[in-house]
């Protein structure tokens, strides 16, 4: 195998990109911000906390209305007719965008893959679950070039079936159907992805040019190439890696390092990663017919293009004249026949480095005959591979896996079926959210919980259990802390975590510093004993799970705290949670859910550089809270005195443990002056303006509700004399929301 890395410059010297290309991304100038554009508040005060992220994706922007129920609409879909229609689209070439080999399988597989492949484990963002590929920036990423055509090809399907199928489900399913029509047996498919109607709020990177890498690697050298968290891609505008190698250097082993890291950040191990690349490249091709600059991306294209981008000036601009990535690689020469040809070709040839007609680095079979059919009937081609394809052979670990599959293709098919299913569904959360008859058996990566196999507790049982909990000797603080630790692990991004399963008693959650393991060790045995006593004596087959009891105990404590402040209120409780086992819990997978900061508990893990108040908003976002809900919850939890480690920061009340609006009243008291502590970092002291005596201490998590103008406006409402009842009601409503965040069984129909 030969290589020549003396010239790694992009083929288009006038491009604003940082490197040559990705698997299907054109060489185009990066969009430039409009000069002298009006400044926004973010421009004037970039360090100010932006709470608007908590109000994205609200019902005002949803044309279907707040009462639309996708599960009910989907239930009316004729799935078999729908499947036939999708396959017909795949197998019917259109003159306006001719299909390679008369079949769109490769294009649709890439569309589905790139929709799902944005998922990243650290914050659960990305993935195919919301149809985000329709919106900027994803619809205009270099890596998604010409996927606008794939979605337009599917428009007749969406138009025909309407609201019975979401764009998110259609985009994901199209790749599944493409594989099945080729003869591949998939592991199944689940529907249930609901569309969003505006771009999701997500930091994709800080680079200001397409294909930039400098910010996410922070200038690290090749000996210590570490991708910053939470990013899942090596390069701005790419799904995973640059297929020409890191920063366009065509080194298969260096590329393998990037592949392993980025796929790992999508929760894929080495075998799953290899399977996805081998299987995903069994059908289709890349497109780099000529060294030309294509037109602007969809978001920057002229209005008459109607949302289509990357107009190609070469020849016909499509078919064999298509320029998408600048790479011109045909893996197996088919879009309609599943086979093991990818590995047979990869291992059946020696490879030498060359360049595509567009000037992109790729490999060509050395001294090989032209045996690969042309997609439009032209002369046959020599076998070609991407740099990242050769990584599957040259990397010792990937090579061991793929060599085995060369001789045992049935093992590769099984591995790919499982990995593809995981790829398509990783961001959908628990299996209770899945719809349709093609759902596969639960896997551990879905964080399974047992089905309910007993009668649930009734109102009388609930009242009795509340009494037992409150008489157990456990304090309001212990009960609230435990319930919060259990439920607040939820992430609305990928629907993981939450109270269902009671995994707060299992590894790794019971050992997380933020959950105060020593306190859990005191509380959980007492609750387990109450559970066991009830289950042993209850009639009619009724039982209560520990997951339910933890939430019920926290709710009982909130009711007591409200009563101690003079308010009678019922905290709604919905039984139906079950208890997961340690065997159903992947410790490594759950480790990424550990909170780095939880402003609601005034907790921050050492070493965090982001300002704590911004991390508070991030936590609220993951809990699917609005700004008023975040405000009410934090203010209530402060007066309940449930800070991490018993800290008194922000406990602005003389009656800790009683649910009152004291936090807001005292925060906004102009008789208190705040200054940073001279003794303790990141702590503020509130002193009486007249005497200078310290009245309170606080962190930025607390003071932001008086400093930020938006949050202060909300805090003022809760501090009003006529809002005492409202505060308690709003706190309880927000508390119940957090406790039920993962109860998808309550809201499907």
UniProtKB/Swiss-Prot annotation:
Heme found in the keyword field: yes
Cross-link Tryptophyl-tyrosyl-methioninium (Trp-Tyr) (with M-266) residue location(s): 113-240
Catalytic activity entry: H2O2 + AH2 = A + 2 H2O; 2 H2O2 = O2 + 2 H2O
Cross-link (Tryptophyl-tyrosyl-methioninium (Tyr-Met) (with W-113)): 240-266
Domain of life: Bacteria
Annotated catalytic residues: 114 (proton acceptor)
Enzyme class: oxidoreductase
Binding site for heme b: 281
GO molecular function, one term: heme binding
Cofactor: how and how many bound: Binds 1 heme b (iron(II)-protoporphyrin IX) group per dimer.
Composition-biased stretches (Polar residues): 14-24
Similarity comment text for this entry: Belongs to the peroxidase family. Peroxidase/catalase subfamily.
Subunit structure as annotated in this protein's UniProt entry: Homodimer or homotetramer.
NCBIfam families given in the database record: cat_per_HPI (TIGR00198), PRK15061.1 (NF011635)
Function: Bifunctional enzyme with both catalase and broad-spectrum peroxidase activity.
Protein name: Catalase-peroxidase
Species for this entry: Mycobacterium sp. (strain KMS)
Lineage summary: Bacteria, Bacillati, Actinomycetota, Actinomycetes, Mycobacteriales
């Amino acid at each position: 195998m030969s290589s020549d890395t003396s010239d790694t410059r992009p083929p288009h010297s006038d491009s604003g990109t940082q490197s040559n290309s990705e698997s299907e991304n054109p060489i185009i100038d990066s969009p430039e911000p409009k000069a002298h554009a009006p400044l926004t508040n973010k421009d004037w005060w970039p360090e100010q906390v932006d709470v608007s992220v908590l109000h994205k994706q609200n019902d005002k922007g949803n044309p279907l209305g707040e009462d639309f129920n996708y599960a009910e609409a989907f239930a009316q879909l004729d799935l078999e007719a729908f499947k036939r229609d999708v396959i017909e689209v795949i197998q019917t070439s259109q003159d306006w965008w001719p299909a390679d080999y008369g079949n769109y399988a490769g294009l649709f597989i890439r569309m589905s893959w790139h929709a799902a492949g944005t998922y990243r484990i650290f914050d659960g963002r990305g993935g195919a679950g919301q149809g985000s590929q329709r919106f900027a920036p994803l619809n205009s990423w270099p890596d998604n070039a010409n996927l606008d055509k794939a979605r337009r090809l599917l428009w007749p399907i969406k138009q025909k079936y309407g609201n019975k199928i979401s764009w998110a489900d259609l985009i994901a399913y199209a790749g599944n159907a493409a594989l099945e029509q080729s003869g591949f047996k998939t592991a199944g498919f689940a529907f249930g992805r609901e569309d969003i109607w505006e771009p999701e709020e997500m930091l994709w990177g800080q680079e200001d040019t397409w294909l930039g890498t400098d910010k996410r690697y922070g200038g690290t050298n090749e000996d210590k190439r570490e991708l910053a968290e939470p990013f899942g891609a090596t390069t701005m505008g790419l799904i995973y890696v640059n297929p020409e190698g890191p920063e366009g250097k065509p080194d298969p082993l260096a590329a393998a390092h990037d592949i392993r890291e980025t796929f790992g950040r999508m929760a894929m191990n080495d075998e799953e990663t290899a399977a996805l690349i081998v299987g995903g490249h069994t059908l289709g091709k890349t497109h780099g017919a000529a060294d030309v600059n294509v037109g602007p991306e969809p978001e920057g294209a002229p209005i008459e293009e109607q949302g289509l981008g990357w107009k190609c000036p070469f020849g016909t601009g499509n078919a064999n004249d298509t320029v998408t990535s600048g790479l011109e690689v045909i893996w197996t020469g088919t879009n309609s026949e599943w086979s093991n040809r990818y590995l047979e070709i990869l291992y059946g040839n020696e490879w030498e480095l060359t360049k595509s007609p567009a000037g992109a680095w790729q490999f060509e079979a050395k001294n090989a005959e032209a045996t690969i059919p042309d997609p439009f009937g032209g002369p046959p081609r020599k076998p070609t591979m991407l740099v990242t394809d050769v990584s599957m052979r040259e990397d010792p670990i990937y090579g061991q896996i793929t060599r085995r599959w060369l001789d045992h293709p049935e093992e590769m098919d099984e591995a790919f079926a499982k990995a593809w299913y995981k790829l398509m569904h990783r961001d959908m959360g628990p299996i209770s959210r899945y719809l349709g008859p093609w759902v596969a058996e639960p896997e551990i990566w879905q964080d399974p919980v047992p089905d309910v196999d007993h009668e649930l507790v009734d109102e009388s049982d609930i009242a009795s259990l509340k009494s037992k909990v409150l008489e157990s000797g456990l304090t309001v603080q212990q009960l609230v802390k435990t319930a919060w630790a259990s439920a607040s692990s939820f992430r609305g991004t990928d629907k993981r975590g939450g109270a269902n399963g009671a995994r707060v008693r299992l590894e790794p959650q019971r050992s997380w510093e933020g959950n105060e393991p020593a306190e859990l060790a005191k509380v959980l045995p007492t609750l387990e004993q109450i559970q066991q006593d009830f289950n042993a004596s209850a009639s009619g087959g009724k039982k209560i799970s520990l997951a339910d009891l933890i939430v019920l105990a926290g709710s009982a404590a909130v009711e007591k705290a409200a009563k101690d402040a003079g308010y009678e209120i019922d905290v709604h409780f919905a039984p139906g949670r079950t208890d997961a086992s340690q065997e159903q819990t992947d410790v490594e997978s759950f480790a990424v859910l550990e909170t780095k900061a939880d402003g609601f508990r005034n907790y921050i893990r050492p070493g965090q550089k982001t300002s704590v108040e911004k991390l508070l908003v991030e936590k609220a976002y993951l809990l699917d809270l609005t700004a008023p809900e975040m405000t009410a919850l934090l203010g209530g939890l402060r007066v309940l005195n449930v800070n991490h480690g018993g800290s008194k920061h922000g406990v602005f009340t003389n009656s800790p443990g009683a649910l009152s609006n004291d936090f807001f009243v005292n925060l906004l008291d102009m008789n208190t002056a705040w200054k940073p502590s001279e003794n303790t970092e990141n702590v503020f002291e509130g002193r009486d303006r007249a005497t200078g005596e310290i009245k309170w201490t606080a962190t930025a998590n607390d003071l932001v509700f008086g400093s930020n103008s938006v949050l202060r406006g909300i805090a003022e409402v809760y501090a009003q004399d006529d809002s005492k009842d409202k505060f308690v009601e709003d706190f309880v409503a927000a508390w119940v929301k957090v406790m039920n965040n993962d109860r998808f069984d309550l809201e499907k129909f």
